[in-house]
Amino acid sequence: MIVLVDGPSGSGKTTLATRLGILLRLPVIHMDDFYPGWSGLAAGSDIIAASVLKTTDPGYYRWDWANDRAGEWVPVPPGAKIIEGAGAVTAETLRAASISDHQVAAIMLTGEATTRYRRAMRRDPYYEPYWEMWAEQEKHHYAVQSQGLGDLVPTLWIDTTGLDAGQVVRRAYDFITYYVE
């Protein structure tokens, strides 16, 4: 199975994907490892479709955030996996995932902006100067890319506001095991 987890910053994508990876025994690919800089959300989506989900030699160039350039090539295990990050779910990434012999599911997280901001700053206080710029890219991504996703693959939407991580994981796990496995 290939599970794509998307949502705005601070919505709980990394926590969810990490815990699902443990429960489902799947490798987790984090888009934070290959976004090409702070203006690279759309390019990150393209990297998933063109490189991470390739049927032969999948992988990506790890982004060197300190030097603002592409770094080493990171091979990705072919087959089942979880990919998480803002921009993970687009029509192109879903098409690329569907080429495989694996079932595909999408999980879209949302959350109240103040809660998400607080979570993101707690995780990485150096992110603060980039919050607005990244939020604009997310806004564009969700306006353009989130329409009709449920028509392409099973898609679960979860508003994480007021939920603890365990509740989010349980909903996602139940969805995956019902619709995908």
Predicted ranges, named:
Residues 2-4:
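Short hydrophobic/aromatic beta-strand immediately N-terminal to the Walker A/P-loop
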Residues 13:
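Conserved lysine of the Walker
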Residues 16:
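Hydrophobic positions on the alpha1 helix immediately C-terminal to the Walker A/P-loop
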Residues 33-80:
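ATP-dependent small-molecule kinase phosphotransfer cores
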Residues 72-124:
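ATP-dependent NMP and nucleoside kinases share a basic, alpha-helical "lid"
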